[in-house]
Protein backbone atom coordinates (compact mmCIF):
# COMPACT_ATOMS: atom_id res chain seq x y z
CA UNK A 1 0.00 0.00 0.00
CA UNK A 2 1.47 3.34 -1.03
CA UNK A 3 1.18 6.29 1.29
CA UNK A 4 2.38 9.77 0.44
CA UNK A 5 5.71 10.29 2.20
CA UNK A 6 5.80 12.82 5.03
CA UNK A 7 8.59 14.69 6.73
CA UNK A 8 12.10 13.36 6.31
CA UNK A 9 10.73 10.35 4.40
CA UNK A 10 10.29 12.67 1.40
CA UNK A 11 14.01 13.47 1.49
CA UNK A 12 15.04 9.84 1.97
CA UNK A 13 12.72 8.81 -0.88
CA UNK A 14 14.07 11.53 -3.16
CA UNK A 15 17.64 10.36 -2.51
CA UNK A 16 16.61 6.75 -3.17
CA UNK A 17 14.98 7.95 -6.41
CA UNK A 18 18.29 9.59 -7.40
CA UNK A 19 20.33 6.48 -6.56
CA UNK A 20 18.07 4.18 -8.57
CA UNK A 21 17.92 6.72 -11.40
CA UNK A 22 21.68 6.27 -11.74
CA UNK A 23 21.37 2.48 -11.66
CA UNK A 24 18.63 2.48 -14.29
CA UNK A 25 20.51 4.92 -16.49
CA UNK A 26 23.65 2.79 -16.41
CA UNK A 27 21.66 -0.36 -17.11
CA UNK A 28 20.16 1.13 -20.24
CA UNK A 29 22.77 3.62 -21.48
CA UNK A 30 26.23 2.41 -20.45
CA UNK A 31 26.74 0.21 -23.53
CA UNK A 32 25.97 3.12 -25.83
CA UNK A 33 28.32 5.33 -23.81
CA UNK A 34 31.11 2.72 -23.94
CA UNK A 35 30.79 2.26 -27.70
CA UNK A 36 29.82 5.80 -28.72
CA UNK A 37 31.79 8.01 -26.34
CA UNK A 38 34.69 5.77 -25.33
CA UNK A 39 35.20 4.18 -28.75
CA UNK A 40 34.99 0.50 -27.81
CA UNK A 41 33.77 -2.13 -30.27
CA UNK A 42 30.11 -3.13 -30.10
CA UNK A 43 31.14 -6.57 -28.79
CA UNK A 44 32.71 -4.82 -25.78
CA UNK A 45 29.72 -2.59 -25.07
CA UNK A 46 28.66 -4.48 -21.96
CA UNK A 47 31.97 -4.07 -20.15
CA UNK A 48 30.99 -0.82 -18.43
CA UNK A 49 27.82 -2.21 -16.91
CA UNK A 50 29.62 -5.44 -15.99
CA UNK A 51 32.29 -3.48 -14.10
CA UNK A 52 29.63 -1.36 -12.39
CA UNK A 53 27.67 -4.48 -11.36
CA UNK A 54 30.69 -6.37 -10.02
CA UNK A 55 31.82 -3.33 -8.04
CA UNK A 56 28.33 -2.76 -6.65
CA UNK A 57 28.04 -6.41 -5.65
CA UNK A 58 31.42 -6.32 -3.89
CA UNK A 59 30.41 -3.10 -2.15
CA UNK A 60 27.10 -4.53 -0.98
CA UNK A 61 28.71 -7.74 0.28
CA UNK A 62 31.12 -5.72 2.41
CA UNK A 63 28.58 -3.01 3.24
CA UNK A 64 27.92 -4.01 6.84
CA UNK A 65 31.60 -3.72 7.68
CA UNK A 66 31.84 -0.39 5.83
CA UNK A 67 28.87 1.07 7.71
CA UNK A 68 30.20 -0.19 11.06
CA UNK A 69 33.57 1.39 10.37
CA UNK A 70 32.43 4.68 8.79
CA UNK A 71 28.88 5.19 10.02
CA UNK A 72 25.84 6.11 7.95
CA UNK A 73 26.67 9.80 7.57
CA UNK A 74 30.10 9.05 6.12
CA UNK A 75 28.69 6.34 3.86
CA UNK A 76 26.32 8.94 2.37
CA UNK A 77 29.13 11.50 2.15
CA UNK A 78 31.82 9.32 0.57
CA UNK A 79 29.40 7.20 -1.45
CA UNK A 80 28.03 10.29 -3.18
CA UNK A 81 31.50 11.74 -3.68
CA UNK A 82 32.80 8.47 -5.13
CA UNK A 83 29.87 8.20 -7.56
CA UNK A 84 30.38 11.81 -8.70
CA UNK A 85 34.12 11.18 -9.07
CA UNK A 86 33.36 8.03 -11.07
CA UNK A 87 31.26 10.01 -13.50
CA UNK A 88 34.01 12.63 -13.72
CA UNK A 89 36.51 9.87 -14.58
CA UNK A 90 34.13 8.48 -17.21
CA UNK A 91 33.87 11.88 -18.82
CA UNK A 92 37.41 13.22 -18.43
CA UNK A 93 39.79 10.25 -18.68
CA UNK A 94 42.16 10.58 -21.64
CA UNK A 95 41.77 6.93 -22.70
CA UNK A 96 38.83 4.55 -22.90
CA UNK A 97 40.36 1.89 -20.66
CA UNK A 98 41.10 4.47 -17.96
CA UNK A 99 37.53 5.75 -18.19
CA UNK A 100 36.23 2.27 -17.39
CA UNK A 101 37.55 2.80 -13.87
CA UNK A 102 34.72 5.29 -13.55
CA UNK A 103 32.18 2.47 -13.77
CA UNK A 104 33.97 0.72 -10.90
CA UNK A 105 33.94 3.91 -8.82
CA UNK A 106 30.24 4.49 -9.50
CA UNK A 107 29.42 0.91 -8.47
CA UNK A 108 31.47 1.03 -5.28
CA UNK A 109 30.14 4.46 -4.34
CA UNK A 110 26.50 3.62 -5.01
CA UNK A 111 26.62 0.19 -3.37
CA UNK A 112 25.62 1.22 0.13
CA UNK A 113 23.64 4.39 -0.48
CA UNK A 114 20.23 2.70 -0.73
CA UNK A 115 20.88 0.30 2.18
CA UNK A 116 21.82 3.34 4.30
CA UNK A 117 18.58 5.00 3.24
CA UNK A 118 16.55 1.96 4.26
CA UNK A 119 18.24 2.09 7.66
CA UNK A 120 17.14 5.72 7.84
CA UNK A 121 13.55 4.63 7.23
CA UNK A 122 13.73 2.65 10.45
CA UNK A 123 15.13 5.60 12.41
CA UNK A 124 12.74 8.32 11.27
CA UNK A 125 9.62 9.21 13.28
CA UNK A 126 7.59 11.10 10.66
CA UNK A 127 5.47 8.07 9.76
CA UNK A 128 5.14 4.37 10.64
CA UNK A 129 8.20 2.39 9.57
CA UNK A 130 6.33 0.00 7.25
CA UNK A 131 4.64 2.88 5.42
CA UNK A 132 7.94 4.75 5.17
CA UNK A 133 9.63 1.73 3.59
CA UNK A 134 6.73 1.34 1.14
CA UNK A 135 6.93 5.02 0.17
CA UNK A 136 10.70 4.95 -0.25
CA UNK A 137 10.55 1.74 -2.29
CA UNK A 138 7.93 3.23 -4.61
CA UNK A 139 10.02 6.35 -5.10
CA UNK A 140 13.23 4.43 -5.78
CA UNK A 141 11.60 2.18 -8.34
CA UNK A 142 10.16 5.25 -10.03
CA UNK A 143 13.79 6.35 -10.37
CA UNK A 144 14.88 3.13 -12.04
CA UNK A 145 11.92 3.32 -14.44
CA UNK A 146 12.11 7.05 -15.22
CA UNK A 147 15.90 7.32 -15.21
CA UNK A 148 16.57 5.81 -18.62
CA UNK A 149 13.86 7.94 -20.25
CA UNK A 150 15.17 11.09 -18.57
CA UNK A 151 18.71 10.33 -19.71
CA UNK A 152 17.41 9.75 -23.23
CA UNK A 153 15.62 13.10 -23.17
CA UNK A 154 18.74 14.94 -21.96
CA UNK A 155 20.98 13.06 -24.40
CA UNK A 156 18.67 13.91 -27.29
CA UNK A 157 18.60 17.58 -26.29
CA UNK A 158 22.38 17.77 -25.79
CA UNK A 159 24.54 14.63 -25.57
CA UNK A 160 24.93 11.41 -23.63
CA UNK A 161 28.06 12.90 -22.06
CA UNK A 162 25.98 15.82 -20.76
CA UNK A 163 23.41 13.40 -19.39
CA UNK A 164 26.12 11.45 -17.56
CA UNK A 165 27.53 14.72 -16.20
CA UNK A 166 24.05 15.51 -14.89
CA UNK A 167 24.01 12.15 -13.08
CA UNK A 168 27.35 12.89 -11.43
CA UNK A 169 26.12 16.30 -10.30
CA UNK A 170 22.88 14.76 -9.00
CA UNK A 171 24.83 12.39 -6.78
CA UNK A 172 26.40 15.34 -4.98
CA UNK A 173 23.03 15.67 -3.22
CA UNK A 174 24.13 12.79 -0.98
CA UNK A 175 27.08 14.60 0.60
CA UNK A 176 25.16 17.87 0.71
CA UNK A 177 22.11 16.41 2.47
CA UNK A 178 23.76 13.65 4.52
CA UNK A 179 23.19 15.33 7.89
CA UNK A 180 19.43 15.56 7.29
CA UNK A 181 19.07 11.79 6.86
CA UNK A 182 18.40 9.94 10.14
CA UNK A 183 21.43 7.72 10.83
CA UNK A 184 22.81 6.11 13.98
CA UNK A 185 25.01 9.18 14.40
CA UNK A 186 22.29 11.83 14.19
CA UNK A 187 18.92 10.14 14.90
What do the PLM-derived regions correspond to, one by one?
Residues 6-22, 104-108:
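Pair of pore-lining "gating" transmembrane helices in MFS-fold secondary transporters
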Residues 59-72, 155-156:
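Helix-to-loop junctions at the C-terminal end of transmembrane segments
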Residues 112-125:
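Intracellular juxtamembrane helix-capping segments at the cytosolic ends
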Residues 86, 97-105:
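Paired small-residue
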Residues 127-158:
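A late C-terminal transmembrane helix in Major Facilitator Superfamily
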Residues 42-50, 130, 134:
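Small-residue hotspots at the loop-to-helix junctions and early N-terminal turns
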Residues 28-44:
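Short amphipathic helix-loop junctions that connect adjacent transmembrane helices
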Residues 74-89:
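Structural signature of the two symmetry-related core transmembrane helices
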